[in-house]
UniProtKB/Swiss-Prot annotation:
PANTHER family: CATABOLIC 3-DEHYDROQUINASE. The gene is aroQ. PROSITE patterns: DEHYDROQUINASE_II. Keywords: Amino-acid biosynthesis, Aromatic amino acid biosynthesis, Lyase. It comes from the Bacteria. The record marks 17 as: Transition state stabilizer. It comes from Carboxydothermus hydrogenoformans (strain ATCC BAA-161 / DSM 6008 / Z-2901). SUPFAM superfamilies: Type II 3-dehydroquinate dehydratase (SSF52304). The lineage of its organism: Bacteria, Bacillati, Bacillota, Clostridia, Thermoanaerobacterales. It is an enzyme of class 4 (lyase). One of its GO terms (molecular function) is 3-dehydroquinate dehydratase activity. This is 3-dehydroquinate dehydratase. Pathway: Metabolic intermediate biosynthesis; chorismate biosynthesis; chorismate from D-erythrose 4-phosphate and phosphoenolpyruvate: step 3/7.
Length: 154
């Protein structure tokens, strides 16, 4: 099983950017933890962070034939990127959207996700654990789908 993990704009600044909201753990630490956890599950992850919307879309286009699913933290693109939403839908791979903070406890303009509707699930508000929880949910979904022939969105 292979999962593409995508991180949107400014997530490369985790650990220094607004630590009272996002915590003090760096994206590199999240990648290391997630990679180790995935390996223990027999899962390979491909991990990227890009600040450009088109770069994230290009990665989806590049890898969709090789992967089983997508774990994505779109960052600010969550709130307005129809193009990213369309890319997720176009490739037909199950995706889970994750966020460190609970968007519904943030500013009003952050309380809507246009990308979540292209995903089978959404996990937010658990800090760095959101990534691991999202990965667990995606792996379990893929295993059930493969074993039971389940399809479609939850």
């Amino acid at each position: 099983m292979k999962i593409l993990v995508l991180n949107g704009p400014n997530l490369n600044l985790l650990g220094i950017r607004e630590p009272e909201i996002y915590g003090k753990v760096s994206l590199e630490e999240i990648e290391k933890d997630l990679t180790g956890f995935a390996e223990n599950q027999g899962v390979e992850i491909i991990f990227y962070q890009k600040n450009g919307e088109g770069e994230l879309i290009d990665l989806i286009h590049r890898y969709y034939r090789e992967i089983d699913g997508i774990l994505i933290n779109p960052g600010a693109y969550t709130h307005y990127s129809i193009a990213l939403r369309d890319a997720l839908l176009a490739v037909g791979k199950p995706a889970v959207e994750v966020h460190l903070s609970n968007l519904y406890k943030r500013e009003e303009f952050r309380q809507h996700s246009v990308t979540a509707g292209a995903c089978i699930g959404y996990i937010a508000g658990f800090g760095v654990d959101s990534y691991r929880l999202g990965l667990i949910a995606l792996i379990d979904y893929l295993k059930r789908r493969d074993n039971d022939g389940a399809s479609g969105k939850a």
